[in-house]
Design a protein with these regions (language model features):
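Bacterial N-terminal signal peptides
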Residues: 3-15
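Beta-propeller domains with acidic blade repeats across secreted/periplasmic ectodomains
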Residues: 18-232
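A compositional/structural signature marking long, glycine- and acidic/polar-rich segments
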Residues: 1-2, 231
């Protein structure tokens, strides 16, 4: 990884960078002795939630499309609350969603659930119509900004899947947190494409709860253990 040489490269979130003039003043001033430069922006990266560098200076970004679209928020369905609180497992939650968003209730669902999979029915299958992404950004020429953007992985879209809210590369693996799982994506040769995707821990988030209150802050601790926070 190239030395920083007193320059701070910042990945600006889309709500800052979108539509902004590239020559405009930065949104805030860095500390004295540092320079603020744009490292990546749309369309190279979009809707970032979390990011982490690997030991080769490559940046992995968790991008969400499910947040605010198909990640159910119990506040929008107060009549579901009591039944939702009775869920004790992901299988319970899956059955609950399939009951509340059945084909028979398509007309009622249409008031709030778009036909994401375009099958003419507003049901639980529409929750599977939008996928999450892990983006890989690189600066192989050490130019000071990302010159290569590739899609590392796209998926995580079952009806019970929440928001991809954590990503952490480690020793040829890329770990990702998205309700209801902690995932490991194997890329031992650092090709930029996983050769295997497996759930290493399952069962988080048995209630609909609040949209976006998911599994965040994925890190490797000094003891070699994986840590992350869990929302409601």
């Amino acid at each position: 990884m190239a030395p920083l040489l007193g320059t701070l490269a910042l990945l600006l979130l889309p709500w800052i960078a979108r539509g902004a003039d590239a020559g405009a003043a930065p949104p805030y001033l860095p500390r004295k002795g540092l320079a603020l430069t744009l490292w990546a922006r749309e369309p190279e990266v979009a809707d970032p939630v979390a990011l982490n560098f690997d030991d080769q200076g490559r940046l992995y970004v968790a991008e969400t499309a499910r947040r605010g679209t198909v990640d159910i928020d119990i506040r929008s369905h107060p009549d579901w609350l009591v039944d939702d609180l009775s869920n004790r497992s992901i299988d319970d939650l899956r059955r609950f969603f399939r009951t509340r968003m059945s084909v028979a209730q398509s007309e009622a669902n249409a008031r709030w659930l778009p036909d994401h999979n375009r099958d003419g029915v507003h049901d639980w299958r529409d929750l599977m119509g939008i996928q999450e992404r892990i983006r890989l950004l690189e600066d192989p020429g050490h130019s000071g900004h990302a010159t290569r953007s590739t899609l590392f992985y796209e998926g995580f879209h079952e009806e019970v899947t929440g928001v991809l809210a954590g990503v952490f590369p480690w020793n040829g693996d890329v770990f990702a947190t998205v309700y209801p799982d902690l995932w490991r994506l194997r890329d031992p040769r650092h090709t930029g494409t996983p050769v295997a995707v497996e759930s290493v821990a399952h069962g988080f988030g048995v209630h609909a709860a609040f949209d976006g209150h998911d599994l965040h802050g994925l890190v490797m601790g000094p003891d070699g253990k994986i840590y992350f926070s869990q929302g409601d």
